């Protein structure tokens, strides 16, 4: 079967997502939309260097072209002041964009051109409107900081914005950022219009220009509360204050849940806020309360003069009861179609009453470890943001109702105090209560839940596709696997495994010859949430970031966009995209917020489910990550998130739960760090009790790349795959070779550290996932291709003379002078005297962190030999090797560098005695 991926439609859908995700906070003095007949002045070097995404694995998408905001304006017919533009171009050439030092070392912002006031005044004479663009980035292993040029504006940016404000009649400020930044100085300078244009991927400039010119009216809404100061956020007192631990004392009161309950006066822009060029009238026309749902019919009428879309948000105010609740909690959302002036649409929203229950982790209601709908009045509010939403209806719950009985899981092992509301005179103040600690014997729980062992049969000729086709059962198939096979299948191979698409993150499943012989294919994983990361240099589509997607509040459009993403994955033989990222925006300084959706778990879960449904339409899927409470990048591989069980279940796990139950998630990645003292990679309660037993998850789980694993009370160890497998975390990502590794699996089988039945369970999970992949279809010989149409040919590198080196049996090339800057390539050729299998040894060093991922891919005659992914080496030379056949006298090689930060020393070729 051949399917079609229309690249033009892909581009258009992504640009539409950008235009719907932009959040306009302010628009005075008729600053926007722009007048097509008037010239504008554009300030800020980011006009040439649009940030398409943040940094790290979530942003390393190789693209042919990024449409920046300047391009978008010009393409939309806006005349840009040429003299100012030429001045910026000249300065930008003389002051190159600073790429930084590679993985986790990119600067948050760039140096800005000092503005000559005479030039500004002269430009203002011919331009009524000035557009100022400020950019920011952050990402993996790089949190934002409360300093100038990161969360705060730099002195250069303040000076630029000030002089422009003093001289121009209208000033439009565009924030090309991954997450919210400080607005204090911006408010003081008072531009007429302020828009968060986020990071919109490769079509970001087009979607942004569509909004600026009025082609599209902005309809994005804030997925986070913007407070006056960073210190106003309830997590601030416990974010990054300790090297190895963050205590979540704010508990369930994250973001607007805190501000609307305790501190409304600290909010500059409320959650869900966003302006349009038009105005809407929102009325709750009808409500119906049944035994299981609250149904609301809401009319939305465009009463302005521009066409546009509006978002309807439903919030619930639950009774305080004995547990304590947030003043308002998002429980429903829908987005209208585009409405022309005077057009009206009735939106239907149903709220599942059971989902309004709160988790009792202390037993104060008499129902410990249960979700409880406490007695009292449940009020519902409808509107376009949390603050302005108006009362719609209510119902009275006569008595406490248990909606779900569970068991204590993931509770903290150390006591601390958390926030709890105290009501005095109709207002809430902050009280404190002790957090319940764990009473669970984790080892005993694991032994109680051991599966039944399947008797070993040896090879019976059963292939995995026989299970798919109903010829044999999964148990019959798994019975064939030896202890050695079971030890191999829990290893992911990578990065850049030759078993799968070149330059991808890992292969899993069929990572040995024996496993391949059973018809187990090698599944393929590729980073990340913003598009496919192909470290061999292959170009892919860069998507808008997670925060922008959440800001759209458009589930339908999200699914449409990710159906295209899924087709692109299928075309590249990728089975799992390592995303969506689903962690909560607990604090605005988290560097990876750009990958994630929101401070709200309901919005997070709904948007993730929409992405997964879209990819499923193309026969592929995403891997929801990082499971769970990955809310800080600094020291992320050792950080302990100390959280109450209630906050975990209601906030930090809830989005994942929605993605599993509503989005059909079938692949999950755990974190680098700990939750309540135990590394998530080996956490039985997380990976088995909650994920599988409570939520009904049927897929497979994986660790993050080179993650630590531990047993309670013991030091972490990257080789303790037995602890990982016992927890029912199925695959360790990653090992250099799936057939041989220094892990402890086989030794643990011998000494009772793990049971064979547990490894069989892991294997069944992995194979059960592979049953539904395109990888298995290919292994079975079933055609399943994707034809890409309307995609322009990728730009080819300029032809450069290639030096040839004569080789008898071995050669070492000194590459210490080769430029290794991100995106560059180096080519050379060998003149061989002897043909055969050659060992390729690459030696390099890096001063980056030990978890930095610095890939370089070697191509032989246009085909990838493999990707050599170095970690930080502390400046010491490290060698990596692969093998490749060479049976042509003249063999040309190309090295592609996908990231900064690598110091290349040499490459050596050695003829082996292996036969072809």
PLM features: what roles do these ranges have?
Residues 388-407:
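Short beta-strand elements
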Residues 1-388, 408-850, 854-916:
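Glycoside hydrolase catalytic-domain context in secreted enzymes
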């Amino acid at each position: 079967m051949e399917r079609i991926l229309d690249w033009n439609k892909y581009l258009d859908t992504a640009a539409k997502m950008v235009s719907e995700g932009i959040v306009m906070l302010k628009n005075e003095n008729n600053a926007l939309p722009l007048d097509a007949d008037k010239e504008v002045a554009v300030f800020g070097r980011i006009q040439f260097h649009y940030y398409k995404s943040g940094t790290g694995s979530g942003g390393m998408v190789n693209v042919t072209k990024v449409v920046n905001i300047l391009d978008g304006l010009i393409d939309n017919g806006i005349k840009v002041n040429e003299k100012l533009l030429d001045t910026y171009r000249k300065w930008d050439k003389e002051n190159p964009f600073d790429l930084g030092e590679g993985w986790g070392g990119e600067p948050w912002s760039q140096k800005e051109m000092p503005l000559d006031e005479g030039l500004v005044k002269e430009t203002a004479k011919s331009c009524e409107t000035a557009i100022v663009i400020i950019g920011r980035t952050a990402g993996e292993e790089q949190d934002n900081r409360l300093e100038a040029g990161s969360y705060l504006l730099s002195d250069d940016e303040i000076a630029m914005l000030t002089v422009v404000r003093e001289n121009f009649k209208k000033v439009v400020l565009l924030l090309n950022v991954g997450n919210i930044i400080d607005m204090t100085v911006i408010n003081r300078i008072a531009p007429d219009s302020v828009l968060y244009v986020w990071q919109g991927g490769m079509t970001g400039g087009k979607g942004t220009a569509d909004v600026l010119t009025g082609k599209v009216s902005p309809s994005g809404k804030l997925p986070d509360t913007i407070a006056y100061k960073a210190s106003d956020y309830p997590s601030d007192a416990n974010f990054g204050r300790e090297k190895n631990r963050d205590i979540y004392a704010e508990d369930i009161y994250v973001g607007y849940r805190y501000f609307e309950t305790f501190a409304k006066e600290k909010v500059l822009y409320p959650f869900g806020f966003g302006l349009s060029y038009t105005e809407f009238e929102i009325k709750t026309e009808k409500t119906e309360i049944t035994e299981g749902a609250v149904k609301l019919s809401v009319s939305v009428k465009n009463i302005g003069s521009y066409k546009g879309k509006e978002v309807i948000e439903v919030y619930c105010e639950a009774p305080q009861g004995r547990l304590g609740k947030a003043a308002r909690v998002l429980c429903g959302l829908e987005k209208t179609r585009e409405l022309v002036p005077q057009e009206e649409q009735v939106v239907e929203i149903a709220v599942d009453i059971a989902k309004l229950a709160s988790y009792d982790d202390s037993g104060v209601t008499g129902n410990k470890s249960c979700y409880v709908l406490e007695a009292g009045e449940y009020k519902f509010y409808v509107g376009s943001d949390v603050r302005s939403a108006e009362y719609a209806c209510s119902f009275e719950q006569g008595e406490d109702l248990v909606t779900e009985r569970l068991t204590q899981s993931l509770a903290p092992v150390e006591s601390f105090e958390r926030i709890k509301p105290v009501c005095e005179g109709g207002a809430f103040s902050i009280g404190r209560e002790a957090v319940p600690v764990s009473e669970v014997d984790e080892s005993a729980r694991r032994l109680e839940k051991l599966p039944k062992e399947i008797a070993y049969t040896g090879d019976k000729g059963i292939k995995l596709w026989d299970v798919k086709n109903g010829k044999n059962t999964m148990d019959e198939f798994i019975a064939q696997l030896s202890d050695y096979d079971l030890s191999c299948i829990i290893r992911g191979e990578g990065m850049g495994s030759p078993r799968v698409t070149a330059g991808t993150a890992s292969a899993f499943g069929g990572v040995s010859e024996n496993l391949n012989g059973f018809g187990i294919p090698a599944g393929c994983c590729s980073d990340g949430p913003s598009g496919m990361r192909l470290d061999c240099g292959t170009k892919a589509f860069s998507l808008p970031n997670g925060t922008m997607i959440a800001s759209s509040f458009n589930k339908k459009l999200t699914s449409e966009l990710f159906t295209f993403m899924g087709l692109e994955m299928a075309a590249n033989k990728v089975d799992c995209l390592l995303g969506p990222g689903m962690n909560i925006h607990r604090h605005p300084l988290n560097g990876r917020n750009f990958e994630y959706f929101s401070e709200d778990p309901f919005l997070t879960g709904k948007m993730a489910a929409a992405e997964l449904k879209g990819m499923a339409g193309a026969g592929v899927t995403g891997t929801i990550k990082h499971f769970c409470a990955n809310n800080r990048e600094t020291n992320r591989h050792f950080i302990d998130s100390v959280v109450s069980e209630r906050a975990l279940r209601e906030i930090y796990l809830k989005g994942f739960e929605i993605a599993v139950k509503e989005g059909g998630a079938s692949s999950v990645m755990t974190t680098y760090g700990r939750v309540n003292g135990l590394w998530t990679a080996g956490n039985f309660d997380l990976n088995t009790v909650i994920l599988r037993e409570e939520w009904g998850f049927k897929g497979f789980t994986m660790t993050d790349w080179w993650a630590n694993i531990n047993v309670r009370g013991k030091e972490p160890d990257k080789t303790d795959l037995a602890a990982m497998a016992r927890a029912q975390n199925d695959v360790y990502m990653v090992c250099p070779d799936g057939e041989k590794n220094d892990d402890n699996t086989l030794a643990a089988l011998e000494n009772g550290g793990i049971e064979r039945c547990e490894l069989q369970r892991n294997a069944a999970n992995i194979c059960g996932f592979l049953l539904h992949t395109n990888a298995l279809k290919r292994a079975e010989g079933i055609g399943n291709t994707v034809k890409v149409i309307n995609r322009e040919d990728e730009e080819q590198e300029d032809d450069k003379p290639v030096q040839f080196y004569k080789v008898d049996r071995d050669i070492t090339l000194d590459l210490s002078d080769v430029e290794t800057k991100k995106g560059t390539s180096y080519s050379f050729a060998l003149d061989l005297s002897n043909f055969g299998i050659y060992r390729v040894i690459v030696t390099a060093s890096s001063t980056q962190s030990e978890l930095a991922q610095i890939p370089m891919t070697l191509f032989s005659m246009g085909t990838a030999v493999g990707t050599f992914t170095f970690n930080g080496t502390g400046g010491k030379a490290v060698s990596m090797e692969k093998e490749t056949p060479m049976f042509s006298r003249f063999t040309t090689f190309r090295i592609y560098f996908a990231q900064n930060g690598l110091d290349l020393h040499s490459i050596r070729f050695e003829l082996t005695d292996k036969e072809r």
